[in-house]
């Protein structure tokens, strides 16, 4: 199929063909145009603090080794031996000066260089050029306040530019709070859903919370419990949504610092966050200080999502068009007491981990929506994301990005899928940029409802 001319997402991101969640040929195309081109989350500084520390991570369907170098920098390499293609490292994390393949014993340094070959002189003589046989390196590795992302494409914009307007909303928690830590290793589970189904859910779907999560809201007694069973809408002014040029976006629920954590944690969390308010008001202003203590449900395009004040951090690793491996970490503020960090991490796994009750609520929705995307009659139907269209603004005096000033809407859906369509119909970054030259105008139209 020629995706340069295939319209999978309508103008302004108002709808998507259902087949985007179930078509295997399209999935293979995504590996080239989405996962080989965009910035993908790898790890966090706190998980590889010392030289020689490494973790394995996924970039699309490929696995990489992410290693702290002797000079403190971080590099990433395909986890594939250059001799006969065997997986080089079979564990999730460790510390090593190098990596030795268990097939024929070829040894690579933590810098990716081929350092040793058994019986090299006897078997190869002078014919083996080890300098050309190092591990394939991920072209770009950059950090957003300790969160490490990698990109295979040299032409990609710098990570900070790629995050764009979304960074303004993330930095109060990621930077100005004093910094974050990632608690690993991640909980892992495989779901029978396309990777985009959970990514779109986290990018800004507050609409489903009261209904899908009714029992979880009631049993957890979180600050959002009043929404259970669609008993009420969030009041006017309770939040907003935003999206950005490269597809990253989020919803903001004001003053939701204790997130989905149960009632026993709420007083301690609210006191901890509240203690930083005076300093943050002075450093970054009242609005961004309020964003720090507000609940953000966010997706960094394409497949990294988070619920900031709930401490949930996700990577949706694709396996095929209808299968995704979900990695769930906890994020905690660096200066939290160690006991509070531990209890928050436990709460994350209890709510959104592999067996979490909030997670279980979502999975059936995501799985059946994805599986229906490959069925004959439903695959060409349109999935709607038009809620709030015509009310979004760009160039607001306070809030950057394309903004929908309501807690419930689909602003960030439209931005996510506008970027998605631009990528799958482009051959490179230059073509994507051309297709995105009027991105905010397209998303803020007031016609074509």
UniProtKB/Swiss-Prot annotation:
Recorded consequence of changing residue 12 to F: In strain: ATCC 17484
Variant or mutagenesis effect after changing residue 225 to A: In strain: G7
Stretches assigned to the Rieske domain: 39-137
Effect of substituting residue 201 to A: Unable to catalyze the cis-dihydroxylation of biphenyl
PROSITE patterns to which the protein is assigned, alphabetical: RIESKE, RING_HYDROXYL_ALPHA
GO BP term, example: catabolic process
Statement: the UniProt record of this protein carries the keyword Methyltransferase: no
Top-level lineage group: Bacteria
Pathway connected to this protein: Aromatic compound metabolism; naphthalene degradation
GO molecular function, one term: naphthalene 1,2-dioxygenase activity
Annotated [2Fe-2S] cluster binding sites: 81, 83, 101, 104
Catalytic activity: naphthalene + NADH + O2 + H(+) = (1R,2S)-1,2-dihydronaphthalene-1,2-diol + NAD(+)
The enzyme's E.C. designation: 1.14.12.12
Cofactor: [2Fe-2S] cluster; Fe(2+)
Class in the EC hierarchy, top level: oxidoreductase
Keywords on record: 2Fe-2S, Aromatic hydrocarbons catabolism, Dioxygenase, Iron, Iron-sulfur, Metal-binding, NAD, Oxidoreductase, Plasmid
Effect listed in the UniProt record for changing residue 202 to L: Unable to catalyze the cis-dihydroxylation of naphthalene, biphenyl and phenanthrene
Result when mutating residue 32 to R: In strain: G7
UniProt similarity note: Belongs to the bacterial ring-hydroxylating dioxygenase alpha subunit family.
Stated role: Component of the naphthalene dioxygenase (NDO) multicomponent enzyme system which catalyzes the incorporation of both atoms of molecular oxygen into naphthalene to form cis-(1R,2S)-dihydroxy-1,2-dihydronaphthalene. The alpha subunit has a catalytic role in the holoenzyme. Also able to catalyze the cis-dihydroxylation of biphenyl and phenanthrene.
Listed name of the protein: Naphthalene 1,2-dioxygenase system, large oxygenase component
Protein's organism: Pseudomonas putida (Arthrobacter siderocapsulatus)
């Amino acid at each position: 199929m020629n995706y340069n001319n295939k319209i999978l997402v309508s103008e302004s991101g108002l709808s998507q063909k259902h087949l985007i969640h179930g078509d295997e040929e399209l999935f293979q195309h995504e590996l080239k145009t989405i996962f080989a081109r965009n910035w993908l989350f790898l790890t966090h500084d706190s998980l590889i603090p010392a030289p020689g520390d490494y973790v394995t991570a996924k970039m699309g369907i490929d696995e990489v080794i992410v290693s702290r170098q002797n000079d403190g920098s971080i590099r990433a390499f395909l986890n594939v031996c250059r001799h006969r293609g065997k997986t080089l490292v079979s564990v999730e994390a460790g510390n090593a000066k190098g990596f030795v393949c268990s097939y024929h014993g070829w040894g690579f340094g933590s810098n990716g260089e081929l350092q040793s070959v058994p019986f090299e002189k006897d078997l190869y003589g002078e014919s083996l050029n080890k300098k050309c046989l190092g591990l394939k390196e991920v072209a770009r590795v950059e950090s957003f306040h300790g969160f490490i992302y990698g990109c295979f494409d040299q032409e990609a914009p710098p990570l900070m530019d790629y995050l764009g307007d979304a960074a303004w909303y993330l930095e109060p928690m990621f930077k100005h709070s004093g910094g974050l830590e990632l608690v690993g290793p991640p909980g892992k589970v495989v779901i029978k859903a396309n990777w985009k189904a959970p990514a779109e859910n986290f990018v800004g779907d507050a609409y489903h919370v009261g209904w899908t999560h009714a029992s979880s809201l009631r049993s957890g007694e979180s600050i959002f419990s009043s929404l259970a069973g669609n008993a009420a809408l969030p009041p006017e002014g309770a939040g907003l949504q935003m999206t950005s040029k490269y597809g990253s976006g989020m919803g903001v629920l004001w003053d939701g610092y204790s997130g989905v954590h149960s009632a026993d944690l709420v007083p301690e969390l609210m006191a901890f966050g509240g203690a930083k308010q005076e300093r943050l008001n002075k450093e970054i202003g009242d609005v961004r200080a309020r964003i720090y203590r507000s609940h953000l449900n966010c997706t960094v395009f394409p497949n990294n999502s988070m619920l900031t004040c709930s401490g949930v951090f996700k990577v949706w690793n694709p396996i095929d068009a209808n299968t995704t491996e979900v990695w769930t970490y906890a994020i905690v503020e660096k200066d939290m007491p160690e006991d509070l960090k531990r209890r928050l991490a436990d709460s994350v796994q209890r709510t959104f981990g592999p067996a979490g009750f909030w997670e279980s609520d979502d999975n059936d929705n995501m799985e059946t929506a994805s599986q229906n995307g490959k069925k004959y009659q439903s695959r060409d139907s349109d999935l709607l994301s038009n809620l709030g269209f015509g009310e979004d603004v760009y160039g607001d005096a306070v809030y950057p990005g394309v903004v929908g000033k309501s807690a419930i809407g689909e602003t960030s859906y439209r931005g996510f899928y506008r970027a998605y369509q631009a990528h799958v119909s482009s051959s490179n970054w230059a073509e994507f940029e051309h297709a995105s030259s009027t991105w905010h105008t397209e998303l803020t139209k007031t016609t074509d409802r």
